[in-house]
Design a protein with these regions (language model features):
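Membrane-proximal structural modules of membrane-associated proteins and complexes
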Residues: 3-120
Length: 120
């Protein structure tokens, strides 16, 4: 399943979320591709939102990167792969992880949005 933005040539080739062997740890993988004849470098940011259930309350929280920011910068020509993990407190159920892709010159409007549910 590919979702993309034909104007920019960017598309999500693969986006998955899995619970690891470690309780409360989830791993996600995202592969972005850029098509076209001679694509120029894509520069932008990714933002992730985690939808979870904790103590019978639904919450949506931003995923924070290693630099303590919500923006995960990307800069690539043809292919970009990101594989990271995050932890949640005990008694928390992850319902989904959403990624939004923004171009550098427009941080208000995402060019692509896709959601992944945890796979067993």
């Amino acid at each position: 399943l590919m979702s993309g933005n034909t104007k920019s040539g960017i598309s999500i080739y693969q986006f998955s979320l899995k619970e690891t062997q470690t309780p409360g740890e989830y791993r996600y993988a995202l592969t972005l591709v850029q098509g076209g004849e001679r694509p120029s470098d894509f520069k932008g940011n990714l933002r992730f939102q985690v939808r979870l259930l904790q103590h019978d309350q639904r919450k949506t929280i931003p995923l924070i990167g290693k630099n303590s920011k919500q923006d995960f910068p990307v800069n690539f020509k043809f292919l970009h792969r990101l594989e990271e993990s995050f932890n949640v407190p005990p008694n928390t159920t992850i319902e989904s992880l959403q990624v939004k892709i923004y171009e550098n010159n427009n941080s208000k409007k995402a060019i692509i949005t896709q959601t992944a549910q945890p796979m067993p």
